[in-house]
Amino acid sequence: MPQFLFVPGGKRSAQDFDSVRGLLRAQGRLSDAITLSDPEQNDLSQHIAEVCALVEEGDAKELHLCGHSYASFVITGAADRLRGRIARLVFIDTLIPESGRSLFDFFKQAGIDPTAFGVPAWPPFVEPLTFDEAAFAALPKTYLHCLRSQFLSLTAGIPADLQSRLASENWTYCALDADHYCMIDQPAAVVERITG
């Protein structure tokens, strides 16, 4: 039975996953969540190191690393450093990182001002992430797409993009009728998708 580690997005707290973790606990499943250090003071590399340190302290045999929003960059970077320790990555209403690009790069490509979404130019959001794309493609991955997300203008193209990559890059796609904070809005639906 897999264990789950939840990583919230920028300036958010591990408490965002309390309801999800409570439902998992009721099923006899183990989970943990981390609050990342202040994104105004620390960068993406530091956040990746924090997740790696927590994983390395534990002894999970089948760990599913789950990242919400900005944390997709964190879990991707952590999985790259922890090869063999992560069984699956779960992307919760987020962008899918590409090696050599930052979160801000995706906003720029879409012609969207990040500050309009309350995303300032803090260090983690402008630092490019570099990782082994072949190793990433080989790792099983789940994408939870929130259809009422405040960030739909950024994520609307993901279903079509993933359709061509489902089999070759080990993706599972799930749509949720939820807003961006689905783990708060619909925790039972999140649990169903990540344990099914």
Each predicted region: which residue ranges?
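Glycine-rich His-Gly loop
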Residues: 7-10, 69, 94, 146
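Hydrophobic, aromatic-rich cap/lid helix
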Residues: 113-141, 145-150
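Gly/Ala-rich beta-loop-alpha elbow adjacent to hydrolase catalytic centers
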Residues: 66-75
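Flexible "cap/lid" loop of the alpha/beta hydrolase fold
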Residues: 80, 84-114, 123-125, 152, ...
